[in-house]
């Protein structure tokens, strides 16, 4: 739980460019995980949910910032 608070505070301090950079890296990692799973090489399947949740957190932060800039 404490790690989640640290992650959220880290996301709120990153710039938009850094967030997009991290988002692209996570999407590439998710693609690689899917590729490994298709080949039967993936050992740690729980990594899927962690990467997907991280992508969702970054997208949420980006949406929050874009909505706050509109007003």
Swiss-Prot record:
GO CC aspect terms: cytosolic large ribosomal subunit
Signal peptide segment: none
GO molecular function: structural constituent of ribosome
Keywords carried by this UniProt record: Ribonucleoprotein, Ribosomal protein
Coiled coil: none
CDD domains: Ribosomal_L29_HIP
Record's keyword annotation contains Ribonucleoprotein: yes
Superkingdom in the source lineage: Bacteria
Pfam families: Ribosomal_L29 (PF00831)
Record bears the keyword Ribonucleoprotein: yes
InterPro entries given in the database record: Ribosomal_protein_uL29, Ribosomal_uL29, Ribosomal_uL29_CS, Ribosomal_uL29_sf
Gene Ontology BP terms: translation
Protein name in the entry: Large ribosomal subunit protein uL29
């Amino acid at each position: 739980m404490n790690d989640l608070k640290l992650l959220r505070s880290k996301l709120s301090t990153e710039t938009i460019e850094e967030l997009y950079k991290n988002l692209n890296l996570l999407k590439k990692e998710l693609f690689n995980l899917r590729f490994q799973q298709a080949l039967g090489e993936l050992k740690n399947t729980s990594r899927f949910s962690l990467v997907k949740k991280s992508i969702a957190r970054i997208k949420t932060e980006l949406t929050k910032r874009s909505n706050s800039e509109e007003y």
